[in-house]
């Protein structure tokens, strides 16, 4: 269990139980996964809820906000609340070291579901121009919904402008151009940063 998940109760047995549940429930059908998790979270007085959208996409809600995620294995990162997860993203990417100003340009290569965008939007409240690149179809759909349709189309950044094979592994969010085990192959459009951003003179943050 990620160490930043801190349930309302610190009881050791409850934490061990939740850890076991996380490992077991991912094998349940999507609808049953949501039902059982919501019952458990209700019993431990946790406000987080999860519902199935379709095709392996889920909506996570807490008392304050909601966001779309892909693959139920990723739900464990939101078990305290969405804000805590986004704070962890800010810490992982050391966003406190970036001086954000109005009009900044942020490029998110491999944006997945848009957690970087949401973390900056939540913690820094700066007006910025966001460009997210995500070629995987399900992740792109969630990205587009989470960023309020800021991303125009599924696209990958690469060293050449071309079409390439792309290997998806949604469960662990480590899809790439390199073929690996248990990955789905798709064909994606790729562009270089120079080709895509011909008129942009300054980039505040580039996440690769």
Segments (PLM) and residue ranges:
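S-adenosyl-L-methionine
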Residues: 1-133, 138-145, 198
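Glycine-rich adenosyl-binding loop in Rossmann-like folds that engage adenosine-containing cofactors
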Residues: 65-95, 153-201
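Short, surface-exposed acidic/glycine-rich loop or hinge patches that mediate macromolecular interfaces
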Residues: 111, 157-158, 208
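Short SAM/SAH-binding signature in class I
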Residues: 202-207
């Amino acid at each position: 269990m990620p160490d930043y998940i801190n349930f309302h109760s610190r009881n050791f047995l409850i934490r061990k139980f939740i850890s076991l549940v996380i490992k077991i429930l991912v094998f349940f059908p999507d609808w049953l996964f949501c039902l059982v998790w919501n019952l458990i979270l209700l019993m431990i007085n946790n406000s987080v809820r999860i519902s199935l959208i379709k095709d392996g996409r889920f909506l996570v809600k807490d008392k304050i906000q909601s966001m779309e995620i892909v693959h139920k294995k990723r739900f464990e990162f939101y078990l305290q609340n969405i804000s805590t997860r986004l704070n962890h993203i800010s810490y992982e990417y050391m966003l406190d070291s970036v001086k954000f100003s109005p009009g900044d340009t942020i490029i998110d290569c491999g944006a997945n579901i848009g957690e970087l965008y949401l973390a900056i939007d939540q913690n820094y409240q700066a007006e910025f121009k966001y460009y997210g690149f995500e070629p995987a179809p399900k992740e792109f759909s969630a990205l587009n919904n989470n960023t309020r349709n800021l991303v125009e189309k599924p696209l990958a950044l690469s060293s050449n402008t071309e079409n390439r094979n792309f290997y998806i592994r949604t469960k662990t969010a480590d899809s790439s151009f390199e073929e690996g085990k248990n990955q789905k192959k798709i064909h994606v459009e790729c562009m270089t940063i120079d080709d895509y951003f011909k008129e942009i003179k300054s980039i505040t943050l580039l996440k690769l």
